[in-house]
Amino acid sequence: MFKGDMNKKRAKALQKVKDAIALHGGQTILSTGITGDDARLAKAVCEAGVKLLEPNHPALALARGHKGVSNMHAAEQIRHEITNGQMAEAVHGVRNVVPDDIFITVGIAGGFTETLPVPLSDTEILEIARAGADGLHTHKSDWDDLQDIVNLAHQYGLTVDAYIGHPDDLHTFGIPARTPEEVSSVAKRMQEIGVDMIGLMTGMSYEGVAAGDIPQAIKDRLRALVGAVDVPTLAEGGINLANAKAFKDTGVNILVVGTAIDNMVCNAAKEAVTPFIAH
């Protein structure tokens, strides 16, 4: 692969992210879930101002009703069964209907900490890149695995967003770091090995948190992340309308929002059809 060409491709992708952050006053959202893999809804949220999208394999398992899963917790257990070809098809459809300045980062089987062996090779990464992806959304929990992903992605002009988790998290979604000091250390090392965007898993998706706020411990961890690196930063897990504003003073650049939007879209669909069957 031509190194110069792919470096230029990746730089263009990163500029999309930086432009989105600037456009939205220092903090924007990465819209995922149902808005990441359904071309109609992806187009709709982009028309509303969203600039960053994330199709991923557990969300596509939900969208396809794979093995009857009906919630993200269940989808995480069988996400590795969603093929790279299925993800590429979803990405290609979304890319076809959104403007070129929209950044698309993609979660694929093998890119997360999977429960069964899922090898990733040049073939899979090239397929995703050609489908229209700008980056890989990853959740590796081992340094060697993460380095391999970074090397593969960069070879084909894709950015990598990787995440820091907590050793006690219900699901393993990143390199573990228990204290803010460890978060800072892990983030710095991620930047050193070439990760383009670094996120923190809040742990709020499944563990729960008081409505309208985020725990002080998470604020401290986010500030440690933000203060440690120069690359764009993200927060993921349990973010909704009630607590989104609480992230503002942490300095994090991007809020990853999926389930909250999914729930609103599903509720809107229920409200839309009710008058037709209740007249």
PLM region descriptions:
Residues D122, M197-A242:
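Active-site/ligand-binding-proximal alpha/beta "capping" segment
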Residues R64-E81, P215, G258-H279:
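C-terminal helical cap(s) of enzyme catalytic domains, especially alpha/beta-barrels
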Residues M1-A11, R178-S185, R221-V229, N240-H279:
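Alpha/beta catalytic cores of nucleotide-metabolism and tRNA/nucleoside-modifying enzymes
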Residues D101-A210:
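Conserved anion-binding
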Residues V45, I198, F247:
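Conserved, mostly hydrophobic/aromatic
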Residues F2-D5, L41, A48, L52-L53, ...:
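Active-site beta->alpha loop and helix N-cap motifs at the rims of alpha/beta catalytic domains
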Residues V50-R64, E127-D145, M197-A210, T250-A272:
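Glycine-rich phosphate-binding active-site loops on the catalytic face of alpha/beta enzymes
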Residues M1-G33:
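N-terminal amphipathic alpha-helix/helix-capping segment at the start of soluble metabolic enzymes
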